[in-house]
Amino acid sequence: MNLKYKNFYIMAENLYEAGDLEKSLALFENAEKYADKDDLIDLYYKKAFIYDELENCEKALGYFEKIHKLDSNEAEAIYGMAMEYEKLDNFDLAEHFYKESIKVKPNYDRAYFFLANLMDIQDRYEEAIEYYKKSINLRADDYMAYNNLGAIYENIDEFDKALEVLDKSIEIEPSYFRPYFNKGVVYGRLKKYDEALYFYNQAMQRKKDYSFIYLNLSALFIEYKEYEKSIAILDKAIKNVSPPKSSLYYNRACSYMKLNKKEKALKDLKRSVDLNRDIIDYAKSDPDFDEIKNNEEFIEIIGV
């Protein structure tokens, strides 16, 4: 190993560990000038990972491609290409390279996991289920895969299967909030109010800044006409969730309307619109606001 390469590499590593990514990258660039062919793959991985952390997907992709050209059997580089293509919303190429990485490394559990995620976000549930199961077969403690599998089963109305795998996720990692949240969703859909409330609260204890817990609890309270409880939980959400979410103010506005507190509803609706103007079209057709559709302040807020 060239001594200059080694020195630049060590300094770059130290800066990376200290969190100075830009300076670390500059020193890895200097190291590359003195790199032997055998050093390049490791060096390109370092640069790819840094560019990925800097959210420069194109640059990261370029270095993963360089590794692939040097050694087509580097499964991690193919997997890296898939990850970057997914971040660039090129799902076809992402799918292709996840599958290619699995061909090179058949026991690549992370590739199966992220391929399953990719299928899931495209609503290709049967394929997602298949790949999550393969990930679990390779990594029995994959609590995230169990959770994600449970969420899919809930989406396709297979509630017993959903609860079974969500329980497995909790058994493996009791501190992970998502399976509790998803059990709340399942029990809510099954109209089991007390169970849904319990699991949403369990999720909140583990992740108090996750806005969807509060939104789902609010919807649950509204469904059972407990409007004061809906407002109280949204008060708590607005305190705990940062940055502020338009949906929290919107739901609280709806709850105030249920209690005929129109001034407070209008105030929250304005806050919601200020945070996200896309909510305007929804508000125009929302029956919760029917009583104030002709109100001057409402018209001013939504710009009718």
Question: Which residues does each predicted region cover?
Answer:
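Conserved alpha-helical positions within TPR/SEL1-like repeat arrays
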Residues: E13, Y45-E53, E76-K87, D109-D120, ...
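Canonical positions in the second alpha-helix
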Residues: A31, K66-I67, E100-S101, K134-S135, ...
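Structural marker of alpha-solenoid helical repeat scaffolds
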Residues: Y34-D36, L70, V104, L138, ...
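Terminal, low-structured helical/coil segments at or just beyond the last alpha-helical repeat
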Residues: M1-N7, M11-N14, D274-V304
